Amino acid sequence: MITSRQLRAARALAGLDQRALAKASRLSLPTIQRMEASDGVVRGNVESLMKLIAALDRIGIELINEEAASTSGGRGVRLKGPAGPRAKRA
């Protein structure tokens, strides 16, 4: 599951506005706006959520759930490591 705070943070980390994220995920701008305005866990149909998560993955954003190993715990987002799509190849 992804929270609205994670979604906003992921979008900011990727340097995208809502319109660009909507285009990248093939969702409507109002859908992205509703998802970001959700309280807590993002609400939406499964297909829309899968499109959103896939788009973030392609962009190079990793979603971190609350069960992930971490010294401080909690949900979050981060840029993917060198194996991600933005990696420079020699």
Please report, for each region that a protein language model flagged, where it lies by residue.
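Short basic helix-loop element that most often maps to the first helix and adjoining turn
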Residues: 7-20, 81, 87
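Residue-level "edge-of-site" marker
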Residues: 24, 45, 69
